[in-house]
Amino acid sequence: MKRTLLNVCLAAVPLAVGGEGLPVPIVWQVNAKTLARRQYIKDIDYLRAHTAADILSPAPVEGTVQGDMDQMRAPMRELAAYARAKGFRVALRTDYSTPGFFAAPAFPSAHGLSVKGPLPNIIKDQAQAQALTVDVEGRLDGTGYACLRSEAKWNREKIIPLYAKPLAAYVFEKAGAGFYRPGSLEDVSACMRVVAQDNRSMSVELDLGAPYAGKDVFLLAGHFFNALEIYEAQYADFQKTFDGFADAALDGAVNDEQGFMPVDAWGGEPFRGRYFSFAGERYWREALKTDFRRLLFDMRYAPAGDAAVRIRAINRYFDEARRVTMAFEDAVADYQLARYSDPFLACHSTYHNSLDSDDFIKNTCNYWSLPRDYGFTDEGTIWPIRLGVLLGSKMKFGYNMFYSKNPDDVYGNIIDCAPWRIREFHHAYNDGRWGLGYTEQPFTANVKKLDEAVRLLDGFQRRGALPRTDVLLVFGEFAHANWYPDEKARGKWDQNASLRIMEKAQEAWRAGHVAALLPDRLVEEGRLRFEDGAFALYPIARTTACDRRAAFNAPPARFRKLVFLYPRYAKRCVWDFLNGAAAKGAALVVVGPADLDVNAEKASFAGRRVAEWDLAKIAAELQLASSRIPGGCVYEDGSFALVSDAILTGRPTKIDLAIDGRRFTGHHTGVLAFRKGEALVATAGSKLFCDGQNVGTPRPDRP
């Protein structure tokens, strides 16, 4: 049977975790120069000598094509074997939504296209291309005629348009903004005639005759781009590539920022497109028994007096986008689990690290649900999201990929993350574009020094408690996805921008409350529950896509207090979760309207609810603690860890903390971790006193 995302099921392979030391991964940008004269051998020797990394993630960039076996198979086989001999694991970085984005093969002249920068690798089977829809509206003239023109938009510059195709046309009588008179809607797609067309635009005529004179018309135009659609083509490309590397000593795939084709609305008009592909349409028709083109129209218009049609259509589109992005992630994880003994499943789907950015479009902000053992984020992801992602992971550790051309920014990321059970995924050796390339000194030596110092915490944190979290913030994904019917709330990325969920989480964090942010899809997944008087967050089940809910085989993170932001349009299981917890006396407050479910049917919440966000009021209502400390993290059992730039400067950092009624004073020289009844874990020269009493002599912990 052909392997597609319509049918994904492989046997699970158990995870084997050895030792207490956490992996130290680094992206390695592999370009044409890397392959020339086996430069990668020298690069591996350099990385072994000058970094603390133990996982290499080669990333094909300019001049290389990840799926070109003639170019990549032999070098990757030798690269992986030599790296393994030098003590590295190798996980190939992948990108399947934009084939050839950085490649430069001969450009097919038949396309007659022009593009700035490196020439792209054109998709051979254009039925595999991803499309964005463009809505074109007009009015039929006195003879029932209209000519409508559509032009490709919202694509990033290097993702070039390949062709345009009219998908559907409807005529109706408008009954106000976004409504039509019931009974007036007619599908006239069979009458569409393309009269002008190139790769970027097309003109479509409708000539319906005098009976249609003056009626409104809606054209759903599809513009297909040089990007693989996600339902079948992306996984097929992944499988072909990794099957081609079957004889290379790889340890997994770094599935980086995967999802739908990237879009662009940063400087221009707001994004109002929808994704379309022929494979996706087939899934809607066969599995969901739905006319997908009609659903795309229903997302824009509803019969007068029945706004629920539009609400349901928007929610259904978003729900399926969630499913298919996760189906691809599950399929890639299943492939690795079936073929590698202990794959390093990585990495993040944070794209621009914001719920109110194109992350919402590209992968539905699925950060918390990726089938990984560790939690992955990147760059400037806010702390409540970082904490929520790591607490929902199996290993209860996170990685934040980071790059900058400023060394101090990189040092700061490593230092700030470490107390919170987060390590840096370094980016990138041989980086010629985004940040430093790990050949600069003293930068590279300093990063190695930081990595080695932070490893003192590995064993301490593995054996210890989780970060003390004052409040769990859960937001309603459908409320965030669906602005309708409030036009004023409609954001640049076609989401509900009025909720400002991240701003609220940041406000709580800056007020000193340790807050973890999660979406309510974790309730749907069976991972967030109320049990034994607390909210329990179970880890992602490392198993097949067939039954991800079954393997709750690792202990959950537990929270006493929860604030639910905006339950409108939530699924019934979420309403049951909220009302069930409230009935059992949970410390729970709901913020915002609580009136409708995902199908626009009536719903209600019987517990404590406030109409608007008011942190002071909510903090008083729930008696929220403020557990943040400067330069470190307090854990659930009262233990704590501190990390500072003293690792590099040699200047001791002063300690003066009050935790659980005890006062801790002294100083540390970069890393210090304390747990009652255990020897102090710290860098040399550190001293710690508890209520004036010396707590003991520091000893380095075993990584």
Q: Where are the language model's segments positioned?
A:
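Secretory pathway export signals and precursors
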Residues: 4-5, 542
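Mature N-terminal, pre-catalytic/accessory segment of carbohydrate-active enzymes
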Residues: 5-261, 335, 633, 681-703
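Carbohydrate-binding surfaces of carbohydrate-active enzymes
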Residues: 22, 34-36, 40, 55-57, ...
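"Short basic amphipathic alpha-helical interaction patches in structured regions
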Residues: 106, 269-270
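Glycine-rich loops and low-complexity Gly/Arg-rich segments
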Residues: 116-118, 371-372, 587-588
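Eukaryotic long, low-complexity intrinsically disordered regulatory regions enriched in serine/proline
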Residues: 366-374
